[in-house]
């Protein structure tokens, strides 16, 4: 139990320290936490929060590779490469084109080893908070032995540009893991 609490606090501290002095969006796990979560579910939510904060908002890819690359991460989004290295490679190129890309988490749900984020992703700072722009995303991660091992998502493009982007980028199959 002490290990879970200590790990959770360290993850939250590392996430906050990196994003504190920037204009990056910060995921506030405390405000999104549900009262019925067990200590293990809170630890799972903190793990995914740290992962998403550093990957999608801080774009701290070196941190992601150092902290999460040892897991056997299976990507079920067929448009993304498999494994953490594939995901980091894709996103590092993506944020070169869209450096203000952010992931505003609206809800977090946890059921045992499954963590679900409902989020609003945008490409531009000016679009943050505008539910007519960007993408409505529901992500599900599976945790096993304190590691993120699987990811599924469902993405709804909210504006014409994102619908066009989804159309032109949606045809490339980057892994053979299946969507379920």
Q: Which residues does each predicted region cover?
A:
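A short hydrophobic beta-strand element
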Residues: 112-123
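A solvent-exposed, acidic/Ser-Thr-rich amphipathic alpha-helical stretch
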Residues: 61-111
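Short, low-complexity N-terminal intrinsically disordered segments enriched in polar/charged residues
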Residues: 19-67, 170-180
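Short beta-strand edge/turn micro-motifs at domain boundaries
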Residues: 136-167
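Hydrophobic pocket/interface hotspot
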Residues: 48, 64-65, 72-73, 87, ...
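C-terminal segment of classical bacterial N-terminal signal peptides
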Residues: 14-18
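Sec-dependent N-terminal signal peptides
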Residues: 4-13
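Short, surface-exposed coil-to-beta transition loops
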Residues: 101-104, 132-138
């Amino acid at each position: 139990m002490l290990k879970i609490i200590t790990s959770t606090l360290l993850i939250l501290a590392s996430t906050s320290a990196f994003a504190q002095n920037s204009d990056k969006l910060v995921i506030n796990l405390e405000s999104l936490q549900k009262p019925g979560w067990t200590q293990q579910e809170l630890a799972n939510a903190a793990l995914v929060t740290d992962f998403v904060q550093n990957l999608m908002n801080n774009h701290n890819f070196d941190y992601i590779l150092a902290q999460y690359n040892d897991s056997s991460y299976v990507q079920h989004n067929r448009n993304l490469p498999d494994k953490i290295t594939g995901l980091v490679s894709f996103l590092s190129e993506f944020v070169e084109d869209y450096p203000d890309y952010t992931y505003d988490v609206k809800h977090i749900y946890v059921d045992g080893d499954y963590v679900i984020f409902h989020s609003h992703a945008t490409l531009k700072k000016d679009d943050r908070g505008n539910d007519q722009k960007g993408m409505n995303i529901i992500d599900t991660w599976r945790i096993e032995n304190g590691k993120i091992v699987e990811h599924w998502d469902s993405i709804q493009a909210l504006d014409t540009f994102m619908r066009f982007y989804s159309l032109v980028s949606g045809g490339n199959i980057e892994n053979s893991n299946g969507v379920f």
